[in-house]
C-alpha cells in the first residue's frame, strides 16, 4: 500500500510538472503574439505617417507645377503678342482693340480748353471773394456797434449785492418787541400808510400803558385767615367796609386816567389823518 501511494504521488507530481510546463509555453506564446501585434500597429502607424507626408509633398508639387504652367503660359502669350506683326496678320487673327467713336478727339480738345478756362477763372476768383469777405466784416461791425449801443441805452438793473440787507432791521424789531416800544423807533422800515397811522399810535400807547402801569398803593392787601380771630365780628365788618370804600375810588381813578389817555390818542389820530 505504501508503494502504491508513493507511485500515485509521483504520478501526480509528474502531471503537475507537465501542466506547469504547458502553462509556461502558453504564456510564452501569448507574449510573442502581443509583441507581434504591437509591431504590426507600429508599422501601420508609420505607414500612415509616411502616406500623409507623401500626400502633402505631392500636393505641394502639384501646386508648384500649376503655378509654373500658368506663368509659362502667360510668358508664351506675352511673347506671341510681341512677335505678332500687325500688318502681316489677317483681320480675323488680329487682337481685339477698343476703337473710339468718330469725333471723340475733338470733344476731348474742347473739354481740355474748357478746363483751362475754368482754371484761369478760379485763379481770378480770390480777389472777388476777399471783397465779399470785407463787406461781410464791415456789416458785422455795424451790427455789433448797434447791439452795444442798445445795451448801453438800457438802464442797468441793480445787482443783488446792492439790495439792502434786513439783518439790522430784524434785530431792531426784536429788541423793540422785548422792550414794548414797537412803533416808537425812528429807524422803521418804510413809511406807514395814512389809514394805519392812528391805529399804530393807539396800540403803542396801550402797550406802553400796560408795561409802565404800577400797582396802586391805595389798595390794601386782602386779609389772611391767620389775621382773623374767631368771634371778632366787628373787626371783620370794619375790614369789609374799608375794602368796599377803597374799590370804587380806585375804579374811578382808573376810569379817569384811561379816559384821558384814550381822548389824547383819539386827538392825535385825527390830527395825523389828512
From Swiss-Prot:
Pfam families: Caldesmon
Cellular compartments per GO CC: actin filament; myofibril; stress fiber
Listed InterPro entries: Caldesmon, Caldesmon_LSP
GO molecular function: actin filament binding; calmodulin binding; myosin binding
Domain of life assignment: Eukaryota
Broad class of the protein's primary localization: cytoplasm
Compartment(s) of residence: Cytoplasm, Cytoskeleton; Cytoplasm, Myofibril; Cytoplasm, Cytoskeleton, Stress fiber
Polar residues composition-biased segments: 182-194
Swiss-Prot/TrEMBL keywords: Actin-binding, Calmodulin-binding, Cytoplasm, Cytoskeleton, Muscle protein
Biological processes, Gene Ontology terms: actin filament bundle assembly; angiogenesis; muscle contraction; negative regulation of actin filament binding
Chain intervals for the UniProt region annotation (Disordered): 1-102, 179-274
PANTHER family in the record: CALDESMON
Purpose: Control of actomyosin interactions in smooth muscle and nonmuscle cells (could act as a bridge between myosin and actin filaments). Inhibits the actin-activated ATPase of myosin this inhibition is attenuated by calcium-calmodulin and is potentiated by tropomyosin. Interacts with actin, myosin, 2 molecules of tropomyosin and with calmodulin.
Protein name: Caldesmon, smooth muscle
Annotated organism of origin: Meleagris gallopavo
Amino acid at each position: 500500500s505504501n508503494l502504491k501511494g508513493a507511485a500515485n504521488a509521483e504520478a501526480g507530481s509528474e502531471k503537475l510538472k507537465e501542466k506547469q510546463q504547458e502553462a509556461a509555453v502558453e504564456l510564452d506564446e501569448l507574449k510573442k503574439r502581443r509583441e507581434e501585434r504591437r509591431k504590426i500597429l507600429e508599422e501601420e502607424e508609420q505607414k500612415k505617417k509616411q502616406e500623409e507626408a507623401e500626400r502633402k509633398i505631392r500636393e505641394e508639387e502639384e501646386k508648384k507645377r500649376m503655378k509654373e504652367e500658368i506663368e509659362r503660359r502667360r510668358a508664351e502669350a506675352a511673347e506671341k503678342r510681341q512677335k505678332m506683326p500687325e500688318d502681316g496678320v489677317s483681320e480675323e487673327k488680329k487682337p481685339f482693340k477698343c476703337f473710339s467713336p468718330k469725333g471723340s478727339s475733338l470733344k476731348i480738345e474742347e473739354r481740355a480748353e474748357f478746363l483751362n478756362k475754368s482754371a484761369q477763372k478760379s485763379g481770378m476768383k480770390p480777389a472777388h471773394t476777399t471783397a465779399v469777405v470785407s463787406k461781410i466784416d464791415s456789416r458785422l461791425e455795424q451790427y455789433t456797434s448797434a447791439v452795444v449801443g442798445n445795451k448801453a441805452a438800457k438802464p442797468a438793473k441793480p445787482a443783488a449785492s446792492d439790495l439792502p440787507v434786513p439783518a439790522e432791521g430784524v434785530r431792531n424789531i426784536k429788541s423793540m418787541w422785548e422792550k414794548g416800544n414797537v412803533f416808537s423807533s425812528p429807524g422803521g422800515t418804510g413809511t406807514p400808510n395814512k389809514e394805519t397811522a392812528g391805529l399804530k399810535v393807539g396800540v403803542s400807547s396801550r402797550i406802553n400803558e400796560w408795561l409802565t402801569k404800577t400797582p396802586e398803593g391805595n389798595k390794601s392787601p386782602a386779609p389772611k385767615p391767620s389775621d382773623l380771630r374767631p368771634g371778632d365780628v366787628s373787626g371783620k365788618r370794619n375790614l369789609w367796609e374799608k375794602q368796599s370804600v377803597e374799590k370804587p375810588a380806585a375804579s374811578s381813578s382808573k376810569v379817569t386816567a384811561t379816559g384821558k389817555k384814550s381822548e389824547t390818542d383819539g386827538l392825535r389820530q385825527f390830527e395825523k389823518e389828512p
